[in-house]
């Protein structure tokens, strides 16, 4: 969030303001928060130097480490790689699955300009991945957006190694 881009139309400024309010407003259980979470507002993690920035909060990621014969396994069937360290009910507190043999602390990423990243056509990202200079091995990751379960896979743009396709899913 931070500050809006210069030159926005009145309608675009209104959208920015609505986003800032939504980003800062605590989510409720009725709106889909919980039962496990890291913070009840997006700004609870993304807040330095302003709402939407990076943060001092660290999160724990986990999975099964890659080997020469198998890629990293994110344990999605067990809830994915992010440990949600808070809950509305202590009986459903999340823990790192015993299957995980790799954990890492990650910093909160900055989100300034995240909407601009989503505006880049998927074809541009795919073309860039397919035409990299020698020695670079970036890959396009495809995931189904959380807001359309059972929908079509989309190009990942956010999160660790582009594993999240939309700002809303993030």
Model-derived regions: residue spans:
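Periplasmic c-type cytochrome electron-transfer domains
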Residues: 1-170
């Amino acid at each position: 969030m931070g500050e809006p881009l210069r030159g926005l139309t009145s309608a675009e400024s209104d959208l920015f303001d609505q986003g800032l309010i939504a980003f800062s407003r605590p989510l409720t259980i009725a709106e889909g928060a919980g039962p496990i979470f890291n913070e009840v507002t997006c700004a609870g993690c993304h807040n330095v130097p302003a709402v939407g920035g990076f943060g001092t909060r660290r999160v724990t990621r986990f999975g099964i480490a890659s080997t020469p014969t198998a890629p990293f396994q994110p344990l999605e069937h067990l809830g994915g790689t992010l440990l949600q360290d808070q809950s509305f009910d202590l009986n459903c507190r999340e823990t790192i699955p015993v299957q995980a043999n790799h954990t890492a602390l990650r910093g909160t990423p900055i989100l300034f300009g995240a909407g601009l990243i989503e505006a880049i056509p998927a074809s541009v990202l795919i073309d860039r991945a397919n035409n990299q200079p020698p020695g670079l091995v970036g890959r396009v990751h495809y995931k189904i957006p959380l807001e359309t379960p059972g929908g079509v896979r989309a190009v990942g743009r956010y999160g660790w190694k582009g594993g999240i396709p939309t700002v809303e899913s993030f």
